[in-house]
Each structure stands twice: as C-alpha cells, then as structure tokens.
Amino acid sequence: MATKLKITWVKSAIGYAKNQKLTVATLGLKKLHQSVLHDDTPAIRGMIRTVNHLVTVEEVEA
C-alpha cells in the first residue's frame, strides 16, 4: 500500500519568511490546526523540511 503523509499546521507563520508562508499555502493549509493528506514524495518531503517548525507530520497507510 502507498504511504500518505498527514500534515497538520500547528504554529502560525506570522514573523517567518515569505517563502515559508508560501510553502504552507502550497501544501494546501489555510487555517491553523487544519490537516491535509499528501502522497509521500520527495517534493512534499522537501516542503515539509522547509516548514518543519510549523507543522507536524504523521505517516498514514492509505
């Protein structure tokens, strides 16, 4: 089965660089404490690495 990543936005991006705010938006997160599911790809992993201090990540079997 394919692994998916559950990404939850847990800390505000206010005061952080613009590229980090854009990365949060690109991940599909619009509000704090919102969660989204994404396929586990290198591109998504790179975005998570950019904002790892703002989000939490869980691996989910889909």
UniProtKB/Swiss-Prot annotation:
Q: Where do the coiled-coil regions begin and end?
A: none
Question: For this protein, what is any one GO molecular function term?
Answer: structural constituent of ribosome
Alphabetized InterPro entries for the sequence: Ribo_uL30_ferredoxin-like_sf (IPR036919), Ribosomal_uL30_bac-type (IPR005996), Ribosomal_uL30_CS (IPR018038), Ribosomal_uL30_ferredoxin-like (IPR016082)
Entries under Gene3D superfamilies matching the protein: Ribosomal protein L30, ferredoxin-like fold domain
Tell me which domain of life the UniProt entry assigns to the organism this sequence originates from. Bacteria
Q: Could you mention a single GO BP entry for this protein?
A: translation
- What are the GO cellular component annotations? cytosolic large ribosomal subunit
**Which keywords fit this entry according to its UniProt record?**
Ribonucleoprotein, Ribosomal protein
Q: Does the keyword Ribosomal protein apply?
A: yes
Family the entry assigns:
Belongs to the universal ribosomal protein uL30 family.
- HAMAP family in the record: Ribosomal_uL30_B
Q: How does it assemble?
A: Part of the 50S ribosomal subunit.
This chain belongs to the protein called Large ribosomal subunit protein uL30
Q: Which organism is it from?
A: Heliobacterium modesticaldum (strain ATCC 51547 / Ice1)
